[in-house]
Amino acid sequence: MAAAVRAAGFLPALCGASAGRLWSRQLYLNTFPTASIWALKAVPSNGPSSSAGARGRCRSTHLGPALQTQCCTPAPGNVTAQQYRSYSFFTKLTADELWKGALAETGAGARKGRGKRTKRKRRKDLNRGQIIGEGRRGFLWPGLNAPLMKSGAIQTITQRSKEEQEKVEADMVQQREEWDRKRKMKVKRERGWSGNSWGGISLGPPDPGPNGETYDDFDTRILEVRNVFNMTAKEGRKRSVRVLVAVGNGRGAAGFAIGKATERADAFRKAKNRAVHYLHYIERYEDHTIYHDISLTFKRTHIKMKKQPRGYGLRCHRAITTICRLIGIKDMYAKVSGSVNMLSLTRGLFQGLSRQETHQQLADKKSLHVVEFREECGPLPIVVASPQGALRKDPEPEDEVPDIKLDWDDVKAVQGMKRSVWSGLKRAAT
């Protein structure tokens, strides 16, 4: 708002100049802060009342409040205004730099993680609740803290009464106290795999893309949060946060990515938005399980997955269970042996699931019918896929039959030899 106000009535008296002339320029309120000090240089006119000794400089600290009244009074003809602002250490720094100094967020101690157990002060937003145009004197400026138009007419600058101004200030103090009280309340986050880890916690859908695309049907789950360090020549041991997340829509589309940043929240955001750009489509048999058993080795991690009927559920490693739910797999058994590095486990799982072969692909490859034997159907085979081309007459050669290595625990379970180590234990008499 640029409300033009002409000079105050006592300007001629302050400057010692003759009245009867108006200022040639208009003074705008946004260029006259109340706390500023103005030095007015009075240039003598050609009249008899002027003299060479009258040239001087007069300063007024109460000129700002006088200019807040809308008036039009005569003023000297040649008056130049120069603005003086108080200059100190606090005007050189920004609010963020001042807060960092007050909260001890800078220095080697903060970078190396020292002082974490002390009672830390909280940063306050001092601009919160402030309205442009509001002041202690209670002036109502149309377009700032008051509507510009009222009943079809432009409002003029008015002032609240003393009682109304006290009520407005009391309401503002009460509102700030409520904000501080709400900030201290802790909201219980969703429980993940355990109470003291970030694994399994949902981050919500990824952020919308630059072209307006949204991912509301996707969900993001945290798999791992680690603090990593890099030794630099300038800052020494520099700490950063590495986050591994997985995203999926529950209908076969899923992906994973890593986000790195100095702050944990920034790492979450980076990983979540990056994972949606590296999606895999996983084929599912009847939208509930995998097409066939999968056994794979990724680096030092060994994963063995088995197809299961409906109602079996997910009996897997907790990270595999989280990823399968994001994919849409509901029934599967998986066993992890060797290294349980989270990144190797995730990469190996996506590699094995994305390379599985559907029944139709297997039928076209072998030129044979693909049949399935179910326990409820007995020896009756169920045809699940047929080749699209000509059917081969001769059976599959023995060399092409995959050599599946059986797990000894599975063999003992089938033959009834697998028993608990505590089955024959007898408690001593007391």
From Swiss-Prot:
SUPFAM superfamilies: dsRNA-binding domain-like, Ribosomal protein S5 domain 2-like. InterPro entries: Ribosomal_Su5_D2-typ_SF, Ribosomal_uS5, Ribosomal_uS5_C, Ribosomal_uS5_N, Ribosomal_uS5_N_CS, Ribosomal_uS5m_N, Ribsml_uS5_D2-typ_fold_subgr. Residues 111-125 have a biased composition (Basic residues). Coiled coil: none annotated. Residues 218-282 form the S5 DRBM domain. Component of the mitochondrial ribosome small subunit (28S) which comprises a 12S rRNA and about 30 distinct proteins. GO terms for molecular function: RNA binding; structural constituent of ribosome. This is Small ribosomal subunit protein uS5m. The keyword Metal-binding does not apply. It is found in: Mitochondrion. Residues 108-128 are annotated as: Disordered. One of its GO terms (cellular component) is mitochondrial inner membrane. GO terms for biological process: mitochondrial translation; translation. Belongs to the universal ribosomal protein uS5 family. Its main location: mitochondrion. It comes from Bos taurus. Transmembrane segments: none annotated. Keywords: Mitochondrion, Ribonucleoprotein, Ribosomal protein.
